[in-house]
């Protein structure tokens, strides 16, 4: 009981709380009020305004992406990313068993089938070893039979591959792989990207939690053509609600921006639309919040890492608890701190 009380007192001291300690609290310590007031004063609060463009440009610069496109949620960003990657109804998508429902929902909107694979204990993200083993047992590469299957106005695929990966048992196309950088920790993304290239599978990174995290100095969400980020209130930086797609293909990014703004062709008075479009654009007032938050992102990441170091120091002498240790060549924003209990299964057996 004494150890339990000491731990509770320690946690309260870290956060300066006497009562309840929430899992996540957004911090507004910069220009948030000034930027929000500017939106209100100018009346540009909806999906058109300078903060939308500024946020996209600043995020592209920060992450090293060729282009960034904001959305109204991280789930929207994942949904749009999968459509742009060419995922269609009845396709299969490789993802990880330790996940969040948003990833599966985005697949379900399209009518695709998730294939759940194991995670690495070292990263809590998709295991390339499990992925390789599953592909060797269950998959084969052959001619892509789904190109041109839909009318152009209904097909969101951008740059379809001539060849595709297929499940030998179900006959379905395995179109994409969605690894998640769980808790902000980078997965073994280079190995996953190599497997995707070898098997003609599109890589769509779920970087919802990992803004500020890098692998070998490269920001998460930029190892494939498309990555998705979330700015929900529990993330390292927030826009209240929102998401973003990161693109390593400038042309694809421009296409995404067009599709997410109702696919409207610019014209002074006519309303012409060349595709089935989506109203997925982030409002200017949310982007204003994002601009201010991004200015302090490195400070917030440093704060999270400091708290993690204090936790590790406090628990280092507690038997049966292992803290997450960053694998070589990775830098995690430590969006969430997790522990593992190696003997837990034995204890409950």
Residue ranges and their predicted role:
Residues 28, 99, 122-123, 184, ...:
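Glycine-/small-residue-rich active-site loops that bind phosphorylated ligands and cofactors
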Residues 1-84, 88, 138, 144-145, ...:
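Conserved PLP-binding active-site segment in aminotransferase class I/II-type PLP enzymes
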Residues 63-65, 71-83, 89, 94-128, ...:
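Substrate-binding/gating loop at the entrance of the active-site cleft, primarily
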Residues 10, 51-57, 65-66, 118, ...:
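PLP-dependent aminotransferase class I/II
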Residues 124-239, 244-246, 251:
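Active-site phosphate-binding strand-loop segment of PLP-dependent enzymes
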């Amino acid at each position: 009981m004494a150890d339990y009380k000491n731990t509770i007192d320690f946690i309260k001291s870290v956060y300066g709380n006497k009562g309840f300690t929430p899992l996540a609290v957004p911090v507004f310590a910069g220009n948030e009020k000034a930027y929000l007031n500017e939106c209100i004063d100018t009346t540009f609060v909806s999906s058109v305004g300078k903060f939308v463009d500024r946020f996209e440009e600043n995020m592209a610069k920060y992450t090293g992406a060729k282009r960034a496109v904001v959305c109204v949620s991280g789930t929207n960003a994942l949904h749009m990313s999968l459509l742009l990657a060419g995922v269609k109804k009845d396709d299969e998508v490789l993802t990880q068993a330790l996940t969040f429902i948003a990833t599966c929902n985005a697949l379900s909107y399209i009518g695709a089938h998730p294939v759940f694979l194991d995670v690495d204990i070292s990263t809590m993200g998709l295991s390339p070893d499990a992925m390789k083993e599953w592909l060797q047992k269950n998959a084969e590469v052959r001619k892509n039979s789904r190109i041109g299957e839909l009318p152009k106005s209904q097909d969101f695929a951008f740059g379809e591959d001539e060849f595709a990966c297929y499940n030998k048992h179900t006959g379905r196309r395995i179109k994409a792989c969605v690894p998640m950088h769980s808790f902000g920790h980078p997965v073994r993304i280079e190995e996953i990207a190599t497997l995707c290239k070898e098997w003609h599978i599109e890589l769509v990174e779920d970087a919802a939690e990992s803004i500020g995290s890098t692998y070998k100095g490269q920001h998460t969400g930029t190892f494939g053509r498309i990555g998705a980020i979330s700015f929900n209130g529990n993330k390292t930086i927030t826009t209240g609600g929102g998401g973003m797609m990161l693109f390593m293909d400038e042309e694809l990014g421009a296409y995404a921006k067009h599709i997410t703004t109702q696919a409207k062709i610019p014209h002074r008075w006519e309303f012409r639309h060349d595709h089935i479009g989506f109203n997925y654009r982030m409002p200017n007032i949310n982007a204003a919040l994002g601009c201010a938050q991004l200015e302090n992102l490195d400070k917030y990441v440093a704060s999270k890492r400091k708290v993690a170091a204090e936790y590790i120091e406090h628990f280092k002498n507690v038997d049966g608890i292992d803290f997450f240790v960053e694998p070589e060549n990775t830098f995690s924003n430590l969006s969430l701190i997790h522990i593992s209990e190696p003997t837990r299964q034995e204890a409950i057996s």
